[in-house]
């Protein structure tokens, strides 16, 4: 298809985006620039997701109205994305009138066709504020880690998912009053009624999605779709246009995806206004030309893995259920997580480098783009570290690509007076000169073909690395040819090499332009050409009168190059003396940046958190010190192998259990509820997050290893007694997978012990340990063998051995 409708996941406006949040926008920008350079009619939209409880609560904390807060953060997001050179055709908001109209219209279509139902449920209610409390309006003490500021849906200190009724000392965040639970009625999207039609559509399109998206969506479908609430008792949101529900708003998951449509509509209206005309019908026709009754539009969406089901399942079901012929998802690129210095980014805790930090760091935006795209987490989680940032920038970007440009063009400027040599090696009568020239051209041709295929498949990281492989090949040709030595004796060979390298540089800059728009445009000027990744002439899309740095006009009219110009060998005549565009990152500077933007300490679970967040609100220093001493008594020093072994043998009970039954969690789509025979005579229930990784049938009958004496906890309303042990690996397709630790030869109840200990059957009811104590003893996979403190784990005299995981950590 030659029409590309490209979206990046709508960022939520409750804080500044961090580097991990920027991955989707950067990825979509690279693909949009590539599409424009290929001549595709392209529309690239994004915007801020502004409704919901997070905006309401954050606004209340800052003494602002939700509208004021959203306006502030919308402008902040817009400025950050502009600094990162994201070439949106339009960047909008979900608080527009168009968004409300389209969301309500979509709801009315669903309701009229019988896909909306009503149900009653219990919800926390504040008597003082006289309102129901959504998750973020209710806080209390986490029953697991005793963090006194846990939200009703999740504790950010220990990461455990919670239910409102499990909070200890629950209170309204606005007034501090303890809530009561009252019945309330809500509207639901009847997904079961849409499942047949959805499955039919899913089977025809998912081959163009990333593996993680397919796997996660299949996990939702295995046990059948469930009805999902679409309304909330809030004020800040799209009002529900239905009698009896006028005081409610739509759940943000329902209205946010409609933002892609409403932002496109706002963009076309803005473009029409700037063009000085256009009737209402013309405006409608423009946005409809992208979203309604179009067979030639390919919808390509970029999201993080936490947003997968909203784009692959819920939004498509909404569109299918409306009965209208909407443009449906064609290709989905879902990335894994980008972590920070061994920990996690956190908007609310302020952990990691944020967009505003990058902007203020003095480091050019293309250096950030380079690293984030070079390490794009396509198939597994990636990690940002300052050390590797420095290494990659200095060695690959500056030492490889920039070095090729500067060395080659400086030599031509000085030695040839800035005139590109006329000697075409492909026409030489000398075999050596011809072969060297044709070898470089073949390298360019092969790289361009591989990159084009990879870019069309949205495998951006591998495509980007092809640029540096070609650059390294050209650097080697320059070094081997050594024209500064050979030119006096072999002028023809030196001239042919330098001419060809000038064209190779032009090719490299074209191929790298979607990734590094500022650098490649500036470097292209040294060759007297310019690059373009803006909308094609007359394309329109939803282009406002936008003028990026990469599209700025030079002093004189110059040839504009596109993707199809790679491999062409005409048009270069002059070389301007190059200037240094990037300086290497110095070790001292990087150390200062790391200290400046870290400001973190390690909590007991190994999660990086700000020092100011280490002491949960409500615990004084004496209580915190006492808790720390208790943890120190329970957790052995990790460097003490003997004590690790002793602690494991005395405190940690791992034993075999047979999986009897597997069901989907009634309140959590990504969780299984397993019933197991653990040899005690009483069935055990464990909740696990294995839905995205394996089918229920793969679990049934398995003899798995469980943590027998782990402190029970409630996960979304189901009490979980223990934990299944598993390890991560990357499968043959390069995607993350999970392998369970199993002992098929063993009986239920048989305990796993260190090789030096005798096998035993553990009595039911051993002393419980918490998660921190369990994870303080690393269980590792070393050459397929499961070990603790360097000693093999055994069951029934046989070692535990993984089938797929060669090296890794068990948890």
Swiss-Prot record:
Residues 620-635 have a biased composition (Basic and acidic residues). Residues 606-640 are annotated as: Disordered. ATP binds at residue 347. Pfam families: Anticodon_3, tRNA-synt_1g, tRNA_bind. Its cofactor is Zn(2+). Residues 648-753 form the tRNA-binding domain. It is an enzyme of class 6 (ligase). Gene3D superfamilies: HUPs, Isoleucyl-tRNA Synthetase, Domain 1, Methionyl-tRNA synthetase, Zn-domain, Nucleic acid-binding proteins. Binds 1 zinc ion per subunit. It catalyses: tRNA(Met) + L-methionine + ATP = L-methionyl-tRNA(Met) + AMP + diphosphate. Its EC number is 6.1.1.10. The keyword ATP-binding applies. A motif ('HIGH' region) lies at residues 11-21. One of its GO terms (molecular function) is tRNA binding. One of its GO terms (biological process) is methionyl-tRNA aminoacylation. A motif ('KMSKS' region) lies at residues 344-348. InterPro entries: aa-tRNA-synth_I_CS, Anticodon_Met, Met-tRNA_ligase_1, Met-tRNA_synth, Methionyl/Leucyl_tRNA_Synth, MetRS_core, MetRS_Zn, NA-bd_OB-fold. Disulfide bonds: none annotated. Keywords: Aminoacyl-tRNA synthetase, ATP-binding, Cytoplasm, Ligase, Metal-binding, Nucleotide-binding, Protein biosynthesis, RNA-binding, tRNA-binding, Zinc. Homodimer. Is required not only for elongation of protein synthesis but also for the initiation of all mRNA translation through initiator tRNA(fMet) aminoacylation. PANTHER family: METHIONINE--TRNA LIGASE (PTHR45765), METHIONINE--TRNA LIGASE, CYTOPLASMIC (PTHR45765:SF1). Belongs to the class-I aminoacyl-tRNA synthetase family. MetG type 1 subfamily. This is Methionine--tRNA ligase. The lineage of its organism: Bacteria, Pseudomonadati, Spirochaetota, Spirochaetia, Spirochaetales.
